[in-house]
């Protein structure tokens, strides 16, 4: 429901943010001692990692919204359908009809799943839920080799 689509909100940006935090943890756990830095054994604070991820998303969304305003771009949210090749009817908070020579339809995307393995958001989750886990699972199977799935296996 925010600008930036899957990548910014529930894909590339949040997965890479968590991956970055994981890499910092790995460095603290395995490399500090090599550099003569003694610290007690580091531990993951998942709520803080998730809060950082959410802040990065917010900052990036705010940047996109700023650019839209700065460039006088009007954004319409809702269900759109073409009336003709230059006109779109939008059902949202209010009904709008817009016309133009150039119209961008940005629908975003949703995770795919196999029949019989529909997400229940508990045991079978999509990447969206995986990026907002409340605790670190002991085991996780990632089905799919896309950018988000590949990032998840390294977090």
Task: Label the model's feature ranges.
Residues 149-150:
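N-terminal Rossmann-fold NAD(P) dinucleotide-binding loop
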Residues 1-136:
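Glycine-rich flavin
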Residues 153-155:
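Conserved small/polar residues in nucleotide/adenosyl-binding loops
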Residues 1, 145-146:
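Glycine-rich Rossmann-fold phosphate-binding loop(s) that bind the pyrophosphate
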Residues 138-143:
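Beta1/beta-strand and adjacent pyrophosphate-binding region of the FAD-binding site
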């Amino acid at each position: 429901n925010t600008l930036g689509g899957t990548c910014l909100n529930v894909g590339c940006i949040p997965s890479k943010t968590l991956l970055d935090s994981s890499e910092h943890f790995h460095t603290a756990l395995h490399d500090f001692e090599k550099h003569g830095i003694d610290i007690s054994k580091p531990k993951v604070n998942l709520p803080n990692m998730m809060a950082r991820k959410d802040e990065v998303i917010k900052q990036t969304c705010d940047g996109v919204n700023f650019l839209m305003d700065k460039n006088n771009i009007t954004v319409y949210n809702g269900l759109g359908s073409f009336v003709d090749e230059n006109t779109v009817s939008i059902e949202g908070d209010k009904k709008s009809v817009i016309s133009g020579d150039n119209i961008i339809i940005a629908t975003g995307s949703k995770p795919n799943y196999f029949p019989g393995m529909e997400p229940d958001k508990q045991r079978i989750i999509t990447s969206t839920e995986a990026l907002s886990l409340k605790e670190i699972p002991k085991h996780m199977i990632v089905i799919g080799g896309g950018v988000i799935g590949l990032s998840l296996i390294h977090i």
